[in-house]
């Protein structure tokens, strides 16, 4: 199924990054450091940004965290990293934003959870205060509903109303309906308090794959605010990656979604940037955006008893990802390049011909030579112990020939 045209959402400017409309779907991430620890948070924000995160969210839960925010923003800028930083507020955001105006000014957006900001009560002073600070500082907000902290009064009322229907919905359906209602009603309340329509982004986070698909389809049908997609918590490792992909792909194919995050639970001392790479890969696999040249490699079988093709595929993919920060500025379009590293003659030549550059390594009982294809045609055949280095030379030459801006010097390849 082809990806449907994007839903027509209003455009929200988040620190210079346009979200919604026909603008590219934005990849965002979140730190897991103590925000009050400026050095650790700066290091992680920069790592996430350099991995490709276009927006980075930080927890602002204490006075120390709020006081640290301007220092974090300034330190990142001093290192040349100007990624917009979003403040994540729960329970006490109204107090922190008022007491620390420099924090309010430094942040590019405020995330507000209507389930813990008094929205919907007779008095919504906490919510109103945060909206007023956003208006004063010309900042957008994301009104983020979580099913784990859904407004209990709203849910109870909707459950009671549902019980009176001739054919009541099940509890799951009512809960998802309540999430949509909470998001939309909160957005309308923000507008009543004076926030502009194009300063609001919505999200409705759940942990179940089918729940996410259903709630976002319902939310998209009743509003034109940009939508931020993601599971509340995806889980560890492959489970988290598969769950996020299974949840986001159908929604994105429907043309729904303007920003995404992969909420992976990192392994102890794991690399936080993995969530950025997974989000990018989801968008690139669907053909929605391109971030880095893709390496196609066969899974291996009895014909490929050597691990050389696996090691080479990993080395080439790593090389491409390392090169992308510099290539992004000097070689526009290189992110769409396709590279194939195949392990035997069965699919090697055919897959290589479908790539911009491909190599078919020898499998079991095959001659020890590796044909290289460029734009579908056999270019050369490599042999010996310098196959990887020679293939990288061909790859670099192709990149310079096809993508370099006129006048840019050629890359010097290394072994």
Curated annotation (Swiss-Prot):
Cysteine disulfide partners in this protein: none
One Pfam short name: GcpE
A GO term, aspect molecular function: 4-hydroxy-3-methylbut-2-en-1-yl diphosphate synthase activity (ferredoxin)
InterPro entries: Dihydropteroate_synth-like_sf, IspG_bac, IspG_bac-typ, NO2/SO3_Rdtase_4Fe4S_sf
Cofactor stoichiometry and binding remark: Binds 1 [4Fe-4S] cluster.
Keyword tags: 4Fe-4S, Iron, Iron-sulfur, Isoprene biosynthesis, Metal-binding, Oxidoreductase
EC number assigned by the record: 1.17.7.3
Gene Ontology terms: biological process: isopentenyl diphosphate biosynthetic process, methylerythritol 4-phosphate pathway; terpenoid biosynthetic process
Pathway this chain belongs to: Isoprenoid biosynthesis; isopentenyl diphosphate biosynthesis via DXP pathway; isopentenyl diphosphate from 1-deoxy-D-xylulose 5-phosphate: step 5/6
Catalytic activity: (2E)-4-hydroxy-3-methylbut-2-enyl diphosphate + oxidized [flavodoxin] + H2O + 2 H(+) = 2-C-methyl-D-erythritol 2,4-cyclic diphosphate + reduced [flavodoxin]
Keyword Disulfide bond: no
Ligand binding ([4Fe-4S] cluster): 298, 301, 344, 351
Keyword Iron-sulfur: yes
Needed cofactors: [4Fe-4S] cluster
Family: Belongs to the IspG family.
Biological role: Converts 2C-methyl-D-erythritol 2,4-cyclodiphosphate (ME-2,4cPP) into 1-hydroxy-2-methyl-2-(E)-butenyl 4-diphosphate.
Protein name according to UniProt: 4-hydroxy-3-methylbut-2-en-1-yl diphosphate synthase (flavodoxin)
Gene name tied to this protein: ispG
